[in-house]
Every structure is written in structure tokens, then in C-alpha cells.
Amino acid sequence: MTVLSNRAKSLKPSPTLAINAKAKSMQAQGIHVISFGAGEPDFDTPQNIKLAAVKAIEEGFTKYTPVGGIDELKDAIIQKFQRDNNLTYKRSQILVSCGGKHSFYNLAQAIFDQGDEVIIPAPYWVSYPPMVALADASPIIVETREENGFKVTPEDLKKAITPKTKAFVLNSPSNPTGSAYTKEDLEKIVEMAISHNFFVISDEIYEKIVYDGFKFTSIASLNEEIKKRTIIVHGVAKTYAMTGWRIGYTAGPEEIISAMNNIQSQSTSNPTSISQKASVEALIGHQDEVGKMVSAFEQRRNYIVDRLNKIEGVFCYKPTGAFYVFPNFSSYFGKSYQGKTIFNSTILADFFLDVARVAVVPGVEFGADPFERLSYATSMEDIREGLDRIEEALKKLV
């Protein structure tokens, strides 16, 4: 008897979680590791949100809720879309799930079949291709270029479209690059989605974490026709430092949301009741802490980009949003340390961890090998020391 399914055997653990686990294991041994691997804000959840959760507990709001979320939270999400994006939705067009990843997974299971193709620009968030594959569809990877700000061009997108194209995955601002699409960029994607009849899955989880006065535009807001073809994947995790609360949400066509609700009813059922109440406060309560977090992230971004670009042989694109940089280390490929040659980003990441005691995530996991992802969701002190360690380690490569 075969123990594991082919589906299970086809999967590997999330590389970002694996890197963090290795770094924590070293730290447990007393080794001082500086981690740039985190995919979550280093700030605490704002106090008003925590108090809303405490109130929910004290009032006994600890039972099952409707599968797709409580009406109060759906209304808060609807209010958020109207306020921030000039988008109008009904409760039946909103689904609350156990995090943004769960939202994407539900969506993939609801709309993809064997033979469908899903266009994913690279660099991409590590979980997109596996979740598409788990739904028996084929991820079609389209490479982007550093000189274009890691954004897919209309020409490259057009080349990837076939009669089997079911959806295009848009992540703006992006994990891992921090690139963000302007309204003008999005209008070109809209034209192709409508003319070639495919869905746009818009992951907007980093919407509020943007810099230099960038104006975020939700692609669904551009016209009614594209809104019908767009499914927005969102959540409270990044904006409100609520990664552990596990609340994501989806907005889209009623038929799709209903199917996702059915899938969720047979898997997790409802998201945590207490987290739902906290998320209501996050979305409709005061937003003071968000601005403070973004301001701190922007200061860190400015420092880390400037510092990386001063390291010989390293180039770092300046991100527009999120809290990651994606520097290019290709000039160090082919060099060696103690007989071991660096010929890909995985070996370089291992080198940084073993020699510099710095954890980064190899770019190959995001579909872009010459790069490493560094999160600046950590203290300025750690950023300074971590980059000093990286620079010193690189000097040892010959």
C-alpha cells in the first residue's frame, strides 16, 4: 500500500517557513542569527483591535459563526471597499476565510479545472504555483525584468495567453519585489482580460503599505466589465500586524463566492469567531497605527536599499510597497568559499546563514534565481548589523 498520495508527494514545505525554522533552530543553540526571512510585520497588533478581541471573549462570542463570516465583518469589508477603492459589493459577494492564503486556495479550488492555464508573473509569491497545481490547473510563469520594475509588460502577457487561459494572478504591491502597478499599467491588463475573456485574481494584501505618495488602484475599480472578471484576495494580516489572527477575505462574483463558501464549509468551516470581531475593529476603527507602521517601514526601506546598493556587485531595485527588497547578487555567482562554488541563490542563502549568520530567502523559490529576498520587517539595529555581515561575507568569496 502506498502511504502518501501523489498530490502530497508533489508538495514541498513553504521555503519561507523552512528558512525561518532553520534560523530559529540555530538561535536555540545560542547562535546569534539575524533574520531577514520574516513575511510579517514586527509590530504588535494595535491596542484597539486587541481590546475588541478581549471584549468578544468576555461577552462569550466563542461559538460557531456562519461559514463565510459574520454579517458585521462582511459589512465592515464592504465599507472598506467603498471607502478605499470606490467599489460596491453585497454580502453575498464577500467570503471571510482563515487568512489570505486560505482565500486563494478556496478560489483555486472553486474555479480551476484540469487543462486550465493560470498566468503568474515571476517573481511570484511562493504559494501561488502550488495552489494552482493542487487545483489540477497549470501555472504559466511569465518572467518580468528588473529594468521594468518587475512588472509584466503587455507584450509578455499577450505571448502567454492561449485559449486555455483561465486567469491572471496580479499581486500589487508584490511579495517578493515590492513592485506596484499604476492605474495606467492596470488599464492595459484590463484590455487583455476583457478581450481574451479571463479572470484577474488580484491579491491586494499589501494595499496600505506603499511609499513615496504612491496611489494604489484596485483593478476591479476601473470599470464594471473588469469588476465582473476580478476576484480580490485581501486580509487584515499585513496592514494591521495581525498575521496570527488568520483572517482573509475575498470579494468577487456571487457565483464564485458561493462556490468558495461551499468548499470552505467542507474544510475549515468558519474563521475564528474572536478574530472576526477583532477584524471588524481593524477595518472600521481608527487607522492611526497603520500610518505609523508604514512610516517606519519607509525609513527602513530607504536605508536598506541605499546600503545594499553600496555593496560592491549588488544591485537593489527600490520597491514601491510591501516590506521586502529583492537585490540581485548575480555578480557573485561562480565565486567560491572554502571549495564550495556559489552557482544559485539557494547556495548563496546557505552561505549567508552559515558564514554571516544571516537568514534570507533564495530568489529561486520566487521564480527568480539571481536574487535573494530580504524582509525589512525587523529593527533598524538588526538591518544595519545584518547588512554589515552580508558585506563582510561577500568579501570572502573569490
Feature map (PLM): residue ranges:
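Substrate/cofactor-recognition hotspot
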Residues: 8
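A glycine-/small-polar-enriched, mobile loop at the entrance of the PLP active site in fold-type I
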Residues: 37-40, 55-73
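PLP-dependent class I/II
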Residues: 2-4, 12-14, 19, 26-32, ...
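Generic structural signal for well-ordered alpha-helical scaffold segments
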Residues: 24, 78, 82, 108-109
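Conserved N-terminal alpha-helix of the aminotransferase class I/II PLP-enzyme fold
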Residues: 64-97
